């Protein structure tokens, strides 16, 4: 659970990287780094479900 929140809320702190996914288009890297580094890393994060997909990918 900590991984999900770490990405979802972590991306939020980096610039809405995981909040919804729209922000992930530009701040996808922030979302992945908020989780650990492999939360999509610009591949899954910039999708429409940035937070969910990057968490699932990790």
Curated annotation (Swiss-Prot):
Q: How does it assemble?
A: Interacts with hair keratins.
Which domain of life does this protein belong to?
A: Eukaryota
Q: What are the protein's UniProt keywords?
A: Keratin, Repeat
One Pfam family in the UniProt entry: KRTAP
**This chain belongs to which protein, by name?**
Keratin-associated protein 19-9b
* Expression induction: Expression in skin and hair follicle is regulated by HOXC13 and by GATA3.
Gene name, per UniProt, is: Krtap19-9b
Extract the ranges annotated as region (12 X 2 AA repeats of G-[YCGS]).
6-52
> What biological function has been recorded for the protein in this entry?
In the hair cortex, hair keratin intermediate filaments are embedded in an interfilamentous matrix, consisting of hair keratin-associated proteins (KRTAP), which are essential for the formation of a rigid and resistant hair shaft through their extensive disulfide bond cross-linking with abundant cysteine residues of hair keratins. The matrix proteins include the high-sulfur and high-glycine-tyrosine keratins.
Recorded family membership: Belongs to the KRTAP type 19 family.
Carries keyword Repeat? yes
GO CC terms of this entry: cytosol; intermediate filament
The root-end lineage is:
Eukaryota, Metazoa, Chordata, Craniata, Vertebrata
> Looking at the keywords, is Cell division present?
no
Which InterPro entries does the record match to this protein?
Answer: KRTAP_type8/19/20/21/22
Q: Which organism is it from?
A: Mus musculus (Mouse)
């Amino acid at each position: 659970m900590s991984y999900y929140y770490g990405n979802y809320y972590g991306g939020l702190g980096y610039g809405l990287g995981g909040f919804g996914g729209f922000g992930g288009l530009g701040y996808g890297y922030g979302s992945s780094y908020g989780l650990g580094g492999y939360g999509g890393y610009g591949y899954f994060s910039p999708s429409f479900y940035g937070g969910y997909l990057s968490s699932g990918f990790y």
